[in-house]
Every structure is written in structure tokens, then in C-alpha cells.
């Protein structure tokens, strides 16, 4: 009741934040004259002065006004650009670890320089994160002169970069790169076998450009480094032939069945489900194809992999459509990002779905993969000490940013008032009527000399509009995932008078449509342009620019609403940049996906009750409210899915932290002899306790079993029964000590043969390899657990609690296995001296071979579904150590050599090299 009154009196929270920062802006402005009077050298020396003051105890907040004033003055001298007051507010917002929402064309790239410069002074590194490599290079090279003028180094991390370059980039004061590359480098660092191989420093401060795209749109997409699993391409092809024989079961909302079938589709959740009839029929088909034994159930434990293939095939055929969710290019299935409309090369769907689509399209089926390391952006970016972000559209997701990342959103005022007109939506009964109205609107704008940007949700829609325009004889450009290579050229001319550009959501990120076109692109196209040519190009552009301004600026037409209001706002934001005139209009129909799936029948009945005729549109608040309600419903559902994914991944993340900490401790240690001793003690205690229960009678002891496990796990044959027969005073504790001493003696003998230094290095390599292999298998087991944990709900159990409980048990088993298997490999392995150069070359070759087999995936998953992969068969020992494990009995050093030479083993084949 009093909220509106209080807001009127004191302003909104956002207004109060902006007002607070305006005081600091005044402090920066007060220093402008002083900075103007400094020479270039004096201005540059301010950086070293700030660093010295920080070392003496001053804080970044205390030097902020001066640092911002220095950065602003350097921007004027080097770039010819002066930071506006609102940009200073944006810089302060970033420095405070918040998200700055800034409209299109307000200079986010320049804003970032303020917070980046200030935080780079601490010498701990600053990461600037972009959504693609093009923007990373563009922004780094664009701002490099400014940073280097101020004495700071700039690096760029890119895929397939030589290790030396990558390490140098991370050692720079400021590092630019994509979210994918930063995330993959983090995972790769935690697979390194020496500290020298690691690239990243401690994660200090990151500024994320297009933060909503990375932290929200990409949140459900884990980063995965994977190796190849078994090949099952033939099975995908066989299943693919069976899927078309299944029919869809269609049922109206009133429960009336309009078509009997084998499966149903839920368009809201994008899920497909076999019914009872479908299960029986697919079992018959699988049996006929020889894939399922006669009389067996598809739900038998050993057939669950087959069931997964069936569902993957169903989803590939019924939920994924060519030119909508993916395109086929160069005999490869390339996924399309629903938020940007761009293709995502290298990204593959998990759970065998990508292979099923390849089978559907008749392409070569790529092998499945097994996860070696994974994380999510949600958990990776929360590792930074301080995080900040910039975007043009964050306010609609402010609650999620605060809940998940503890990042408040501050809406930064525009430098000039927004002059764009956003017209009401026009809703038609059919898509045909809607597209006819769009063509009519385009005609009108062309006659006025206004440029038009037509935004579509899919490639199909963009090509349909293109065909309609061709039929009318209108010249136009199409920008979608098929023509992305021409993006810069098309966008550069999209603001010319009368230009018509049809684009999917691609045109929403990192691009500005300049009214009149982009004269700089024209100049760049000329080789060695003269001053006269440049002047003429500028003059021509000025005429076109004025012509478009007088006509009303850029007009944005959207052919349908997106699931997210944020994506709609991004499209609108293409028009009206920096106070320019412009307008936007959304054209909808009752046949659009969002309206069909989420808007209630009430809207349809309401429109029909009005007696609307063909071609008529409706502009009514009730319809607009229904659309916004549908969008909020979808946004809420997507938020719940992301939150659920995070809750599950948080469990794995805590385990990941423990394993990576253990790994880093091993890498940092000069030698791990004490760790090996602890592993041996714990593994031995567990083995003895399993065969000699505490406080048990000698009659209950399993001595043969203990002797067997000591040989299998510790590589030493010990006559325990003989000891007990010869010494009646031996009891549980003294026997334990005697066994431990015998194992130590055997291991010390191995150390004498190989040399202490060589064995210490070997121990570290073995423990790291065992840890990596068992962690890989643990990830696979966790995937399987998460995939089926929702079924516990049918037993009245909480799936999340069950997942936490079982994953904790699995993790305890993992830690025990690391200790036991490390000792097992070290006990069995035959160590020989090796030339250091040869050893380094061998390890390097192994690392290169491993890298060749790795795949870097950013695979789409749901909160509960992960890849169904068979865990690698390790049989108690890591693959890398198999070649080193003895299969023959151990030969004593003083025994005759088995080669038949007559010499003792230690003087023949057992001689230390």
C-alpha cells in the first residue's frame, strides 16, 4: 500500500544506487583539469604510482577517482574517446562486482576499461570474457593501445594456441578470451602432470560481456573434456530404421483421443514418452531386428542402454528439425544456438542424441565419448574472487543473477534519452496473414526510405520471408546460420536508406547497425585510400545518415515472440542507439509456437468472438498480457531447470574441489613419500581388517585370503601362516606391524634398484594417473546415478537427498580406491632407470597422444539427463600402468637369471641401467 508512495519519495533502489555513484563521478570530474595538464610520460607514470600506493596499504576504492580520471584522459589521448559520466557509473558498478545493464550503443567496451584498469593495478590479473573469439580479438586489439599507453600488458587466449603463447597471455595484466576457452583451460590445468604445464593464475577478477548470454543462456550447458568410448554407430543406424514405424499418440486437452499411437510429445518440456502400446511394439521390432532376445524386456538391466538408444532416436526424429535446431554443413550436424541463431561448431548433444541425428541425416556417425573432466559455467565463474558483467538486457533476470551468483543488477542511465517508439503487438489468426502484414510494413518503410531489420526465430522463417520478398521483387539480404560468414558485411550496410535485412537472432550480439551504413567498412575495402576518397565517402555517408534520420531511423520487425522477454528486448535494441530515432513492432499469430503451446484457449476464443475476418489484426491489452504471462511462465520454468541443475552439480562441484585440491597438492610437492606411506598404511589396515576382524579369535582369521590380497594388492608373497605357526606370540597388532615392515622392505629394495630420486618422480606420476582414471570413472558413475535418480520419487523418496547420500558414498569409495590402486600399481610395477631426456620425451609423447584423443564439448543437457556412457574397464589398475605391471612371479636379485646365462639376476637382466 505504501510502497508506491515510498518509491516516489525516496526513489527506487536502482535510482538510489545511481545517485550514490554520482558523488564519486563528481570527484573524477574534479580531477579532469589536473590530468589534462600532465604530459604523456607523467600520465603513464601514474600507473606505477598507484601500484606503489596499493603496496603501502591503500585500497582500490581509495584510488578509484584518480585511476578513473587517468583512464579517461588516456582514452581521450589514445582513442579519441572520452568516458561520459554515465560510463563512469558503469565502471564503478563493474568494480563493485555488479552487473551493469546498458542500452545498445552506450559503449560497454569502453566502460569496461575503467574497472579493468583499476583492478589490474593489483597485479593479480583481470579476465575479460566475451561470447566468441571474434569479439575477444576485436575488443583486445581495439583497447590494447589504451592499456599499453598506461603500462599494462594485454593477452588473448584462443583455441589451439601454443602453450608458451597461452601461458604468456595468462601472465599478462589483462587477458581477453571466450567463456569456453577460460573454462576449458581451467579443466586442462587440472589434468596437467606438472606445475609448468598449468596456464591460469588464481582466478581474481572477471568482467563478462553479454553476461546474460553466458551465465543464463549457457548455464545448463556443461563444459566437457572427453575421450572416445566404444563405437556403437551400427546400433544407431539399426535403431534409426525402426523409429519411422512408430506413430504419435495425439490427445486433445479435453481427453479426446484424435489419433492412436505409440508415443506422445510434450512440446512445453520438449520431451517424448513411449506409452504401453509403444513399449510392446518397439520390443517386437527390436526382437525382429535381432537386437533384443526373444521374450526379453526392454527394461531389463542389461537392456537399458538399448532403451536409451530408442529414446535418442525418437527425440532426433520428433523434436529436432533440420534448419530449426540444427543445419547440415560439410556432412556435419551443426547445432544452432536458439538465443543467437548462430551455429555452434564443435558442440555436440549428449546422451547419444547427436549420433541419432547423424543417423537420421544419413551422415557418418561420430564415436561416443567418455567424460574426462567437466564443470558448468555456474560453478566455474563462482570460483573468481570478484565477478562483474555487462549487457543490454539483464533486468528481467535480476532475481536469478542475485540468487545464483550474488550479482546485483544496476540499470545505467542512457547518455541521451531513448527516442525509439515500441508499437503494440499485432496478433493475427494465421501465420499466412501475419507474414502478409509484415511484407506490407516492409513496403511502406522502403517507400519512406527507412532501413528495415526483420527478426525471425528460425532459419526456416527467415528463408520464407526471403521468398515472399523475392516474389515482390524487393532486394534484400539474409543473415542466418547458413550465411554467417557475411555477417560483418551485411550488418555494415543494414542501416542504408531502404535496406531490408532479414536476420535470425544472430544480429543481437556485439553488432551496431549505423544509420546510413558504416563508412569505415567502405574505406577499409579500398586499398591505400587517398584523403580525397575518404572525404568523399564520409560526405556520401553524411547525406545517407541525414536521410535515414529524417525518415524515422531503423524499423525493427519481429515475426514472433521468443520464449524469453530478454531476447525480444535485444532485437528491439538494434533500433534507437545513442538517442537515434527508430521503431519496433512484433507481428504474431495464434499458430506461433509460443501462442500455441502456452497462451490459453481463452485468447483464441476471445479473438473468434470478436468476429475477426481474414487479414484483420487485434491490438488488445488482454492479448498482450496473455503473451507476457506465457513468457514469464517459460522463464520461470527455465530458471527452475537451471536451479535444479546447479543443485545437482553443486554436489559434484564439492567433490571436484577436493580432487583438484588433492591434485594441486601432489603437483606442488617436491616428493610425496609421506603421502605414499599414508596410502600404504590405510590400504593395509583395510586389507587386514577385512580378513582379521578386530578383536576376533584366531579361528576366525582368513589367512589364505589375506596372503592372496597381499600379493594381488601389494605385490609381495608373505608366509603369514608360517609366521603364525613359528611364533605363538604373534597377535593381531604385532602381525600388522610385521606385515607392514615386510612390505616396506620390499619397496625399499625397489628403491635401491631404481634410485630414490627416480622413484619419487615416478610415484607422483603414478598417483596422478590413478587419480585421473578413477575420477574419470567416478564422473561416469555420477552421470548414471543422476540420470536415473528421479525414479526414486516413485518410492516416496526425495531424489535430491538420495543423490547427495549416494554420491557421498561413491566419493568415499573413490578416495579409498585412489589409495588402494596407487599402492597396487606402485607395488607391482617394475621400475628401471631411464635417461631424463628420454623420460621427458616419452611423457611428452603420451601427453600429445592423450590430447589427440580428447574432445572439448559444450554439450546440451537437462537438469537430470547426462550421457549414458559405459565406464572404461580399468580392472583395478589405470590403463597407463598396464605395460609396467608384472604378470610373472617376482625374481629375487640373487636368484639365477631366467634367461639361462648362469649369472645372478642382479648381474644380468636385473642390472640397474
Swiss-Prot record:
Swiss-Prot/TrEMBL cofactor(s): Zn(2+)
Comp. bias (Basic residues): 903-913
Q: Give its localization.
A: Cell inner membrane; Cytoplasm
Under the heading Pfam families, the entry gives: P-loop_SecA, SEC-C, SecA_DEAD, SecA_PP_bind, SecA_SW
Cofactor binding annotation: May bind 1 zinc ion per subunit.
Matching PROSITE patterns: SECA, SECA_MOTOR_DEAD
Domain of life of the native organism: Bacteria
| Enzyme Commission number(s) | 7.4.2.8
Binding-site list for Zn(2+): 897, 899, 908-909
The processes (GO biological process) annotated in the record are:
intracellular protein transmembrane transport; protein import; protein targeting; protein transport by the Sec complex
Q: What is catalyzed by this enzyme?
A: ATP + H2O + cellular proteinSide 1 = ADP + phosphate + cellular proteinSide 2
Query: Which keywords does this Swiss-Prot/TrEMBL entry list?
Result: ATP-binding, Cell inner membrane, Cell membrane, Cytoplasm, Membrane, Metal-binding, Nucleotide-binding, Protein transport, Translocase, Translocation, Transport, Zinc
One molecular function GO term is:
metal ion binding
Binding-site list for ATP: 87, 105-109, 512
* Topology in membrane: Peripheral membrane protein
Q: Which SUPFAM superfamilies match?
A: Helical scaffold and wing domains of SecA (SSF81886), P-loop containing nucleoside triphosphate hydrolases (SSF52540), Pre-protein crosslinking domain of SecA (SSF81767)
Broad EC category: translocase
Stored Gene3D superfamilies: Helical scaffold and wing domains of SecA, P-loop containing nucleotide triphosphate hydrolases, SecA, preprotein cross-linking domain
The record's annotation in NCBIfam families points to:
PRK12904.1 (NF009538), secA (TIGR00963)
**Could you give the subunit structure recorded for this chain?**
Monomer and homodimer. Part of the essential Sec protein translocation apparatus which comprises SecA, SecYEG and auxiliary proteins SecDF-YajC and YidC.
Q: What is this protein called?
A: Protein translocase subunit SecA
